[in-house]
């Protein structure tokens, strides 16, 4: 499971001209679910996002989590994060989870985020979305859940 997270001063998702999810200060999470991902990946990423200290303290040091700054989460499904551009000019999405599994695990990620107590807004799975954001910094990170080891 992969996520691109961005520290934002505001973000919103628009579907068919209507705002379906919005936050002020917080983290925009673009989430890609891959084949082989499981609930443990969604739980791990949610906990990582909730605790990651990417907001500045009084001294200007990245030392505070989204929870500590009373921020929000905007979670948007993004299957293209599972795209492979290594060969040719057209991305391959062979590693992306099938839509039903992607939707289920995206939903579990949102559930896990909400269980942390952080207000969490969402986009709409498989919708054509317009994502508007003001990246604060800019601050952007790529996260990937640890792959399970056989053992």
From Swiss-Prot:
GO MF annotation: an example: Ser(Gly)-tRNA(Ala) hydrolase activity
Catalysed reaction equations from the record: glycyl-tRNA(Ala) + H2O = tRNA(Ala) + glycine + H(+); a D-aminoacyl-tRNA + H2O = a tRNA + a D-alpha-amino acid + H(+)
UniProt-listed Enzyme Commission number(s): 3.1.1.96
Gene3D superfamilies with a match to the protein in the record: D-tyrosyl-tRNA(Tyr) deacylase (3.50.80.10)
Lipid biosynthesis among keywords: no
InterPro entries: Daa-tRNA_deacyls_DTD, DTD-like_sf
GO BP annotations listed: D-amino acid catabolic process
Localization of this protein: Cytoplasm
PANTHER family named in the record: D-AMINOACYL-TRNA DEACYLASE 1 (PTHR10472:SF5), D-TYROSYL-TRNA TYR DEACYLASE (PTHR10472)
Function: An aminoacyl-tRNA editing enzyme that deacylates mischarged D-aminoacyl-tRNAs. Also deacylates mischarged glycyl-tRNA(Ala), protecting cells against glycine mischarging by AlaRS. Acts via tRNA-based rather than protein-based catalysis; rejects L-amino acids rather than detecting D-amino acids in the active site. By recycling D-aminoacyl-tRNA to D-amino acids and free tRNA molecules, this enzyme counteracts the toxicity associated with the formation of D-aminoacyl-tRNA entities in vivo and helps enforce protein L-homochirality.
Subunit annotation: Homodimer.
Protein name per Swiss-Prot or TrEMBL: D-aminoacyl-tRNA deacylase
Species annotation: Geobacter metallireducens (strain ATCC 53774 / DSM 7210 / GS-15)
């Amino acid at each position: 499971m992969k996520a691109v997270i961005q520290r934002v001063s505001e973000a919103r998702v628009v579907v068919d001209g209507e705002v379906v999810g919005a936050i002020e200060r917080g983290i925009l999470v673009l989430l890609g679910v891959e084949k082989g991902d499981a609930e443990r990946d969604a739980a791990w990423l949610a906990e990582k996002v909730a605790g990651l200290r990417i907001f500045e303290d009084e001294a200007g040091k990245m030392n505070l989590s989204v929870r500590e700054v009373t921020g929000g989460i905007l979670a948007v499904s993004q299957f293209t994060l599972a795209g492979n551009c290594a060969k040719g000019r057209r991305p391959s999405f062979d590693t992306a989870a099938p839509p039903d599994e992607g939707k289920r695990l995206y939903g579990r990620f949102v559930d896990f985020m909400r269980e942390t107590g952080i207000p969490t807004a969402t986009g709409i799975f498989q919708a054509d979305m317009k994502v508007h954001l003001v990246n604060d910094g800019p601050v952007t990170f790529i996260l990937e859940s640890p792959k399970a080891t056989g053992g």
